[in-house]
């Protein structure tokens, strides 16, 4: 006699096992940890397991997470500014002044936005440095990896980040913004034959005016953020597709694959294995329980700490560091000296000293220092994964011996950029003369 089926009531989880956020602080099994990812859309960015080594704070310094948190802060702080700012040469400055001095918490929101923009440039650059110095752009032991293309995308994302900050620089429409953008766009005009056309396309005319402001405004609030968001999503998908951080590759390469115990009575008819036999399963070290942890909750927890820590740090900094607002933009009064944004000051410094005379032929310093040299640097940086001949054992290793020479050259270039940036920021005075940081500048009126 067949007994009737009786529905059994599911037993509730013990108190404290699952949190209201949809994941467990202490999962009872790997399956429960994996189910948290499968059942929550927000956690789909995380793999089921991650390498313990790649979780270390001192390996990646979580610079990618910090960069993403700063991008989120830029969007969050930019939304109220979007409703308050007026992109008009007649009203832009006054609307920013109202945000700064009239709107409740307006000064703090603007400071958060500005600090986040500057810190994002630094964080993305440091993230790129970390990837280079660890050789994380090289493929490891896994099949189907394309880390080199993710590196190329990272270089493009750095350039977009710089341009995103540069387009926002003009929006306050004060003297600092107007002349910084003037200096920056003048470098583009130094390209032979096409330079003036490139500059006109960039600023919408021959002078910086209403068309320039509208172009920079649309680029800053729509096109560049959307493009950067799409690239970030693909970048993270590619990281997961390539097996996570390159540090995990070291564990897979240094440890020999282990053979699973053979159970002669096991059968897998779907695979065509004959009865009485069993396949030999080889597991890489990255898959071993002793070298991995569950992404939920370990990776999620550390991601939350890095994100919230970044947001808190920026919020506190914005209390003490106000955003500057100088006099309204005036094309007839040139500040002395007129400087590019700080992240382009190293280029302005090179431009000053790179005019080359070859007989009757003269190479413009703006073209040499502002186009040729940075173009070569970006080109080499982009192509380096294919030029680097180091072994896979150097992948994911800080300052690997086989990469000592290229790391040294890379660091020398970075140090040179930092020195030039410092000189341009702290040591250039009126008429672009050199002064010690503690030395007073002479009283020289602005150029009219």
Model-predicted regions and their roles:
Residues 30-34, 48-59, 63, 312-448:
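Aromatic-capped, Gly/Pro-kinked transmembrane alpha-helices
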Residues 214-215, 219-223, 228-334:
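Long, contiguous internal "core" modules enriched in hydrophobic/ aromatic residues
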Residues 67-79, 155-186, 305-332, 412-426:
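Hydrophobic alpha-helical membrane-insertion segments
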Residues 66-76, 114-129, 368-385:
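Hydrophobic alpha-helical transmembrane segments
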